[in-house]
């Protein structure tokens, strides 16, 4: 996992009825709802601070909605291939094996090990080591996938500690 900070203009949509005395509050809510803790293009905004002491570019009227470009200071988080993370092993069937972390889902290919059934629950066997369903495992991220709204998605392999 890596972090970086940048200033950027984030476009948000404001409805005409939101153009009132609470305009800045409505803009803040729109920015937070659209960008905070949402994965887009491999990055997730973990902290957003709206910069209020700079001029804001002119808004655009698009299909009866107002598009405002808001100046923000953003802390972004991202994962890259080769990162090592820990999470909970989740096995729903022989072909659906994943490791769930706080904001990342790592899919494990079934051909990298064997799914078996032990003590009335699924387990994953790799190189003779048994990993029980819902146990904590360590994975190495191998390939980025298209993410879900609030989670990064990667293919990966379980590694031994």
UniProtKB/Swiss-Prot annotation:
InterPro entries the record matches:
DNA-dir_RNA_pol_18kDa_poxviral
Cellular compartment(s): Virion
The organism sits in which domain of life? Viruses
Catalysed reactions, semicolon-separated: RNA(n) + a ribonucleoside 5'-triphosphate = RNA(n+1) + diphosphate
Q: What turns on expression?
A: Expressed in the early phase of the viral replicative cycle.
Which Enzyme Commission numbers does its entry carry? 2.7.7.6
Instruction: Write the protein's name.
Output: DNA-directed RNA polymerase 18 kDa subunit
Q: Provide the species name.
A: Fowlpox virus (strain NVSL) (FPV)
> Taxonomically, what lineage is the organism?
Viruses, Varidnaviria, Bamfordvirae, Nucleocytoviricota, Pokkesviricetes
């Amino acid at each position: 996992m890596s972090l970086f900070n940048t200033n950027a203009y984030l476009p948000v949509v404001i409805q005409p009825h939101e153009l009132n005395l609470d305009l800045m509050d409505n803009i803040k809510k729109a920015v937070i709802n659209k960008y905070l803790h949402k994965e887009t293009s491999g990055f997730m905004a973990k902290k957003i601070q709206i910069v209020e002491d700079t001029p804001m570019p002119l808004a655009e009227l698009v299909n009866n909605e107002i598009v405002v470009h808001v100046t923000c200071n953003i802390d972004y988080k991202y994962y890259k291939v080769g990162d090592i993370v820990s999470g909970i092993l989740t096995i729903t069937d022989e072909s659906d094996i994943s490791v769930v972390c706080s904001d990342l889902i790592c899919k494990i290919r079934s051909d990298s090990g064997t799914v078996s059934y032990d003590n009335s629950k699924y387990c994953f066997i790799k190189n003779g080591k048994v990993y029980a369903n819902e146990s904590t495992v360590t994975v190495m991220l191998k390939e980025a996938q298209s993410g879900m709204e609030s989670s990064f998605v990667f293919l990966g392999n379980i590694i031994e500690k």
